[in-house]
Amino acid sequence: MNYIPTQTFYGRRWRPRPAARPWPLQATPVAPVVPDFQAQQMQQLISAVNALTMRQNAIAPARPPKPKKKKTTKPKPKTQPKKINGKTQQQKKKDKQADKKKKKPGKRERMCMKIENDCIFEVKHEGKVTGYACLVGDKVMKPAHVKGVIDNADLAKLAFKKSSKYDLECAQIPVHMRSDASKYTHEKPEGHYNWHHGAVQYSGGRFTIPTGAGKPGDSGRPIFDNKGRVVAIVLGGANEGSRTALSVVTWNKDMVTRVTPEGSEEWSAPLITAMCVLANATFPCFQPPCVPCCYENNAEATLRMLEDNVDRPGYYDLLQAALTCRNGTRHRRSVSQHFNVYKATRPYIAYCADCGAGHSCHSPVAIEAVRSEATDGMLKIQFSAQIGIDKSDNHDYTKIRYADGHAIENAVRSSLKVATSGDCFVHGTMGHFILAKCPPGEFLQVSIQDTRNAVRACRIQYHHDPQPVGREKFTIRPHYGKEIPCTTYQQTTAETVEEIDMHMPPDTPDRTLLSQQSGNVKITVGGKKVKYNCTCGTGNVGTTNSDMTINTCLIEQCHVSVTDHKKWQFNSPFVPRADEPARKGKVHIPFPLDNITCRVPMAREPTVIHGKREVTLHLHPDHPTLFSYRTLGEDPQYHEEWVTAAVERTIPVPVDGMEYHWGNNDPVRLWSQLTTEGKPHGWPHQIVQYYYGLYPAATVSAVVGMSLLALISIFASCYMLVAARSKCLTPYALTPGAAVPWTLGILCCAPRAHAASVAETMAYLWDQNQALFWLEFAAPVACILIITYCLRNVLCCCKSLSFLSATEPRGHRQSLRTFDSNAERGGVPV
């Protein structure tokens, strides 16, 4: 909780032990003491003289004390002390001594002043101290009702969090001021505690002080225990006779508690008294000292006075004083006190476009305005009748008073009905206002049943489509769920900061008051105040409260209107204005918009199946539930839908992340993990597969580049091998009788000569070298074994001799021969 400060361990009167030095201290060598023989002799001499003096005093006899002389005082004649302003000089001296004794603070007060010197700061408004702010733990606390700014440059610029529940404003203490803060404690054994004005008694969970010890301006002062810890902060007090009960904010073990005795008043210092004016004379608005300042004594003059002061700061104090006629005395407020302002107002008849039968009329229940700022779907309806007060200006919550012609009639509140597409549930009523929760619809109707059992109704076109609280369309508030912030119209009749304008009603013409009697016109007022203006004769203009007859006149020559300037009515655009439209009054309206928390259900958690860069959600809603998701990258993409049945949704999860929100559950954020197939340290194809899953474009580029490099290397190697073979075999081909070495023949795959056939060659080998003949049969077997081994291990790099011989161009083939000494044969092929 923000209003429970954290204990700090910075003591003002405690000095910590200095830090130990990490290096050993080296002992400084002590200089040798040189004995001073002269000083020793002088000391011995002084000791001997002192001993001799003490011995002589002991031997001398003690003298008896001298007898004290008694002072003889002459009797003085008694003189009567002079009286100054009804008090003698002695009494005046005693009063001064008593004042001096009172001004000297006691032990408790001195201790509190010593602690308060560091942890308390004045709150000033226009240079005047209105209260105090206190540093407790790691927070600075100031009563919310204290107007002004803390008299400290660092604390004045802090951002405070306000709590109307505890009447506190709280902010974090700057780091450099934490050493000045006081500790707090929740331990409060019964006994006496200390504050600025002395002792505070704590008993039965209440803090009390002697009456007169505290006063307005002490709001925000702390109460300390004997260890200097804060146990409570004073907000105000309630006078209970000899003692005053304090209204405080204190701490329990795990929570903050506000103790407010009955009848307690806030102890912020009063600001400049608001002044009102009457006939060029000023007076305090809350205490009018004039005769027409009571509505019950002179209603019309009182309303005129209120209209003259409508724009002054103390207007509502003047209104309260004029309606209660308290003249400075304070009255206990009650629920009926909130309805007291309506005795200066009256219901009225206004134009209504649809009176329930498809035609317009002047209805006593005309709808003026409909407000729907509340997020919970509550409607605040204003209409022309008044609820909670009867026609005798008495508070009665079972009555509705409405205008019936010039008269005011009562109806039963239970006959009030509000409807849209269906009947609405009425939550609260007061004055001109109704609180109701209605189903969706395209119109709004308000109706009552009058004294003749006739239905008086008014209907207006109004589109009402209440949005659900939260993200689920539920019909019944659950027992368990989640608390989310919302707004509603507070169901209280107390005064609010909202207000409506009132004005004096105009004169209403009424020809029914005129009757023709044998050439004369009779005006029957019926207890009303009537203005008349007849053109027959002279002087037939005026105002009357009783029946009168105008001689020798016709009804057509007279104009009669009922005037009533004893009550205000709402300044409606559907009602004619009075003769002076600039004059108006104001009254507070009930049911303010309040920030609260609403309990909403929580949808069942979805079943989540994770995939590769995607997630699959199985959604099972109990009622229409909103499902939405969005990406978390630089360009977020948002999607939402209302889910009414069990569905399955697969949504992508990019690398930047994704957030999905299901119903009133907390949003969930997911990021795709860098996973892929293959192995980073496996076979080549596994390595390629692994990196292709992570970086597909880079992997393809790398594989293509390596393949091109390998092909270029292979072609270059083949070209270099062919060139080297040609360079190696050309000299032997051009040199007659040159023999190719067998190693070079194997490396260069030298082709055999075509001088003799296979049979001739085999016959020659049989005759000349039979060992080589048998090796010729072993050569095919060896070739088969080599080819099999190469195919098995896939390590064959060279082509077969016949393949290289077949691929070589025919024109470039050379026959290698070797010759002996027989010139006729021309040589023998090898």
Swiss-Prot record:
Catalytic activity, as annotated: Autocatalytic release of the core protein from the N-terminus of the togavirus structural polyprotein by hydrolysis of a -Trp-|-Ser- bond
One GO-annotated biological process of the protein: fusion of virus membrane with host endosome membrane
Region (Disordered): 58-109
Keywords: Autocatalytic cleavage, Capsid protein, Clathrin-mediated endocytosis of virus by host, Cleavage on pair of basic residues, Disulfide bond, Fusion of virus membrane with host endosomal membrane, Fusion of virus membrane with host membrane, Glycoprotein, Host cell membrane, Host cytoplasm, Host membrane, Host nucleus, Host-virus interaction, Hydrolase, Lipoprotein, Membrane, Palmitate, Protease, Serine protease, T=4 icosahedral capsid protein, Transmembrane, Transmembrane helix, Viral attachment to host cell, Viral envelope protein, Viral penetration into host cytoplasm, Virion, Virus endocytosis by host, Virus entry into host cell
Annotated disulfide bonds: 119-134
Bias (Basic residues) ranges: 65-107
Name by which UniProt lists this protein: Frameshifted structural polyprotein
Organism: Semliki forest virus (SFV)
